[in-house]
């Protein structure tokens, strides 16, 4: 997966994109990540997490 490309397209930091993708691959949902994993996402909103997911 090209985390750098996703980060560029979404305008988000690559570090957080990588962590969101890892959480998604582990089976976490967008609402769960945006509510309960703010420390891993740098405080991304549910819309931003969904952008990474798509």
Placement of each model-derived feature along the sequence:
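Long, charged, helix-rich clamp/arm modules that form nucleic acid-engaging surfaces
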Residues: 1-54
């Amino acid at each position: 997966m090209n985390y750098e490309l996703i980060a560029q397209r979404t305008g988000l930091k690559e570090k957080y994109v990588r962590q969101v993708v890892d959480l998604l691959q582990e089976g976490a949902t967008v609402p769960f990540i945006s509510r309960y994993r703010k420390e891993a996402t740098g405080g991304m909103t549910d819309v931003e997490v969904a952008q990474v997911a798509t």
